[in-house]
Amino acid sequence: MKVLVYFQPNRKYDNYEGARMRKTIKGALEVVGATHTSNIYDDYDIAHFMSPEDESKMSIALERGVPVIVSALFGEDDPSARFLSHKSKDGKRTTTLRNRALKMLNKATLVLVPTESAKKFLIESGVETPIETCIPGINLARFNFSREDEKELFYRYFREDKNKKIVLAVGEYDNNLEGIHAFINVATKRDDTVFYYVGSETTNLNNGRAKTIIKDAPKNVHFKNILPDDIYRSLLLNADVFMLPGYNLAGIISVEEAMAAKCQLIVRKSSVFPELVKNEKTAYIAQFSETLTSLCLDYLDGEIKPTIQEANEQVSEHSLQKFGDQLVNIYNSLIKNK
């Protein structure tokens, strides 16, 4: 069996969640001995896509008569892998499936999503294609704490004081940076901690409220665009806290990596699937910014217990071997029944 694993974003997004998902799928297939290609014009038995932007490429695979799988809702912080759109008006936030995404998903043979709540959302949004849950695996070896050289990369790259704690947040740079003050307000009270916000620049930050927020942030807060993969991983390995201050659904890939890197998760309720993390067991979850800020401060002060070990044990169950076996079983079933 040969699998087309296709995701080819704009180069500046080729270190982000979609690219990391592509790497995970390829790695899982290699672990279980399955062959893969990224050439749409190659010979293959089944095709696996990850982005609504690739609908035209998916049509090429469909014309060849091969089954087509689409993985959805795993990398929502990545503009190149995003299936959802979000709007905020008069204090009310709505999340909908993008029209292009709906069209693509309804052309596929099968849709894979990480959780049952994701499946329910797609069905309610008009997806008629069969949907199965399959949480992405993770290469646990990439988060090996015995590799001091991996951890050292962050300090060589950013020249930070090793005695300071680190809080990492991920999201996107929209016009308002909604929810960001839950992150910034922690920084105003912690001179002994450095804060990094990493995201994709989807709007022009030279104008609007986001520019003002970034300009007025404390000096211990650093806003970064997408980082090289090894630098980002090193940042994760050194971070004490992984925070999701935004309101929009975050990428499950980023959450799994933070769990593997043994960061303490402090996340907004709307940013994660309810099945992925459990409050006070594998993460601290809050709805309001004030609570997120308070939780982060309490954790840094040692006033609430870590949930790191439980989270790491949970994500350790999602190995590349297990993910690869699941994918191959799904692929074989579709090929057999085509």
Model region roles, listed by residue range:
Residues 170, 194-210, 225:
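Glycosyltransferase donor-sugar binding loop
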Residues 208-230:
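Nucleotide-activated donor-binding/catalytic signature segment of Leloir-type glycosyltransferases, i.e.
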Residues 76, 91-111:
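Membrane-proximal helix-turn-helix segments that form the acceptor-binding/catalytic region
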Residues 160-178, 184-187:
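Conserved donor-binding/catalytic core segment of Leloir-type glycosyltransferases
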Residues 247:
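Aromatic "clamp/platform" in nucleotide-sugar-dependent glycosyltransferases that forms part
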Residues 264-267:
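Short hydrophobic beta-strand element within catalytic cores of glycosyltransferases
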Residues 104-130, 138-142:
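A short, active-site helix/loop in glycosyltransferases that binds the activated sugar's phosphate group
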Residues 279-290, 297-303:
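Conserved acidic donor-binding segment of nucleotide-sugar-dependent glycosyltransferases
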